[in-house]
């Protein structure tokens, strides 16, 4: 027997289509950080809700910001090896 969902998920919308004043620019890493994971991966548009046009622009601007060292490529990697203390 299949269970029915109690509520429908909220409709996702493109933040950039809704707010025309929101700049999509590599110079604004504070906005671009909302669209990458903590590991540095670009979040898919089916999750963020951006339209196809703005997702392409968003991807291009994130890559530009990475080249300009405004955003990280990947998360910092801990090797798991502990450093010896100098006591």
Curated annotation (Swiss-Prot):
InterPro entries: Ribosomal_bS18, Ribosomal_bS18_CS, Ribosomal_bS18_sf. PROSITE patterns: RIBOSOMAL_S18. Keywords: Ribonucleoprotein, Ribosomal protein, RNA-binding, rRNA-binding. GO terms for biological process: translation. Signal peptide: none annotated. One of its GO terms (molecular function) is small ribosomal subunit rRNA binding. It holds the Pfam family Ribosomal_S18. Coiled coil: none annotated. SUPFAM superfamilies: Ribosomal protein S18. GO terms for cellular component: cytosolic small ribosomal subunit. PANTHER family: 30S RIBOSOMAL PROTEIN S18, SMALL RIBOSOMAL SUBUNIT PROTEIN BS18M. Part of the 30S ribosomal subunit. Forms a tight heterodimer with protein bS6. NCBIfam families: S18 (TIGR00165). Belongs to the bacterial ribosomal protein bS18 family. Binds as a heterodimer with protein bS6 to the central domain of the 16S rRNA, where it helps stabilize the platform of the 30S subunit. This is Small ribosomal subunit protein bS18. The lineage of its organism: Bacteria, Pseudomonadati, Thermodesulfobacteriota, Desulfovibrionia, Desulfovibrionales. The gene is rpsR.
